[in-house]
Every structure is written in structure tokens, then in C-alpha cells.
Amino acid sequence: MIALFNKLLDWFKALFWKEEMELTLVGLQYSGKTTFVNVIASGQFNEDMIPTVGFNMRKITKGNVTIKLWDIGGQPRFRSMWERYCRGVSAIVYMVDAADQEKIEASKNELHNLLDKPQLQGIPVLVLGNKRDLPGALDEKELIEKMNLSAIQDREICCYSISCKEKDNIDITLQWLIQHSKSRRS
């Protein structure tokens, strides 16, 4: 009965109130961050992406939720900016190229260094292993192990294996983020 009431209340709120969430998307260069933003925004995959220089900000509306998405460059010279753009957001989305196993160790180190920053304590993290359509790509279980995600105890953390190219698991990623946005405000 309570679950039914909560669903009815959510539906009623959706009629009258727009929800907003702010996300920061970080990860090493060529992991698919900008592609992810474009797939969410337009449903289109573009093979010819140019690496992000600095950052891009995009607002995307899905249903009654407006998502303000900060897409931060992944080259070494931009990584010092990650912390600043991650402060106070609803969630941090950390993109990993799951098919490039040579960069997994560096990706793990960058993630853990970022999450060690005191200003980011408690902010939830969604780790996305992109490019699951490529041969040799790590699955969720392997990503959790190689990225040492089980060591992250001070916040909510979730991991999905996705393919921006094939649009695999993009919908559940959005559902998690939107649901998470609702639970953070409750």
C-alpha cells in the first residue's frame, strides 16, 4: 500500500514539479564521455568525435528531469580540474574504456585519487565501462575487480557495462541517475 502511495505521489509531483540534477562526467581521454553525452541528448552515435578541450556543459531534459552535465576533458593536463567540477553535484559519472586494458590501471588510480579529495566525500559515483561491444572488453564483474571498486566504502557506488555505439544499457544508466537524484533530495 505504501509503495502504491509513493508511486502516486511521484506521479503527482511529476505533473507539477520539474526535477533538476547536476552531474560531472570524468575519465581518461578517449573513454567515450562526449559520445555518452551525445547519445543521451540525441540518441545518435557519431564515430568522429574530437577530444574535449577543457570542458563542455550541456543541459538535457528527459521527461520531467533536467540534467546539467559537465563533460570534462580526460587528457592529463585537464585532470586537475576534475575535483572543482565534481563538488556539490548529484553524482559523479566516471567513464572507463573497458576495451583498453592497458589504461585500466591509470584509470583506477585517477578515480581513487579523485575520490580521496575531502570536498567530494559522500558524492555517489557511477562507473561506466564503455565499449562493451569491442572484443576483450571487461564486463561489470571484471571492472569492479580491476578498478578496485569494492575498496570505496564512503559513498554509494554503482557500475554498469555499456556501449554508446550500440546504445546498450544507456537506459538503465539514466534510470539509475534519475532515481538517484530523487533519493538524494528525499
Swiss-Prot record:
One of its GO terms (biological process) is cell division. Keywords: Cell cycle, Cell division, Cell projection, Chromosome partition, Cytoplasm, Cytoskeleton, Endosome, GTP-binding, Lysosome, Membrane, Mitosis, Nucleotide-binding, Protein transport, Synapse, Transport. GTP binds at residues 29-35, 71-75, 130-133. InterPro entries: Arl8a/8b, P-loop_NTPase, Small_GTP-bd, Small_GTPase_ARF/SAR. SUPFAM superfamilies: P-loop containing nucleoside triphosphate hydrolases (SSF52540). Residues 1-19 dip into the membrane without crossing it. Pfam families: Arf (PF00025). Interacts with PLEKHM1. When GTP-bound, interacts with RUFY3 and RUFY4, but not with RUFY1, nor RUFY2. NCBIfam families: small_GTP. It is found in: Late endosome membrane; Lysosome membrane; Cytoplasm, Cytoskeleton, Spindle; Cell projection, Axon. It comes from the Eukaryota. Gene3D superfamilies: P-loop containing nucleotide triphosphate hydrolases. Transmembrane segments: none annotated. Plays a role in lysosome motility. In neurons, mediates the anterograde axonal long-range transport of presynaptic lysosome-related vesicles required for presynaptic biogenesis and synaptic function. May play a role in chromosome segregation. Ubiquitously expressed. Its main location: membrane. Belongs to the small GTPase superfamily. Arf family. GO terms for molecular function: alpha-tubulin binding; beta-tubulin binding; GTP binding; GTPase activity. GO terms for cellular component: axon cytoplasm; azurophil granule membrane; cytoplasm; extracellular exosome; ficolin-1-rich granule membrane; late endosome membrane; lysosomal membrane; membrane. This is ADP-ribosylation factor-like protein 8A.
